[in-house]
Amino acid sequence: RDQDERIIVIHNFVHACAGAGKTELIVQRCANTADQKRRLVITLTDSGQAELISRLSGVCSKSQMPDVMGWYAFMIRHYVRPYLPILFPHVRPTGFIFDRAMHPKDHFKLGGSRRYFSSNGSIYKETLPELAVKVAEASQGAVEKRLGRIYDEIIIDEVQDISRKSLDIIERLLSQA
């Protein structure tokens, strides 16, 4: 079976099984000198980001180089920080708690901002996707419209490793395309 048949491109969403060459497809798409698209490439892991930046640096001019960021940074930078005041006007994110062991055992049972934030304002990794979806819903499409003004194309790598709630964010992005 031809490798290209295993790669599915829907709008600007690339999904393929491990080893199918999707990272190379992303690199080649970004290296295309025929277009001058403003691109964002999102990947789940730090190692994935480092690999993409290294490979893209080898084939993209400075003007072609896409923004590369992690999934959690994407949710914080483009969903939570700009639109959090819609849900929680008095909360200011101060950090990010990645380590699940640092989360209170009962934070999922809590209501309001305490479900998503520690007492000092740090965002819990486990509830960040849920918070991002709630912020997007409350913004009534403003999050996706803003992303559309910033980027012509959003490419997500390593999507097979993200959480179910994170897939809701991707679904929202695809529905805006």
Protein language model regions, located:
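Catalytic phosphate/metal-binding cores of nucleic-acid and nucleotide-processing enzymes, i.e., regions
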Residues: 1-10, 14, 61, 70, ...
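A generic membrane alpha-helix/interface feature
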Residues: 56, 88-90, 175-176
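P-loop NTPase Walker
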Residues: 1-83
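Inter-Walker segment of RecA-like/P-loop motor cores
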Residues: 43, 61-134
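Conserved helicase NTPase motor core
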Residues: 7, 110-177
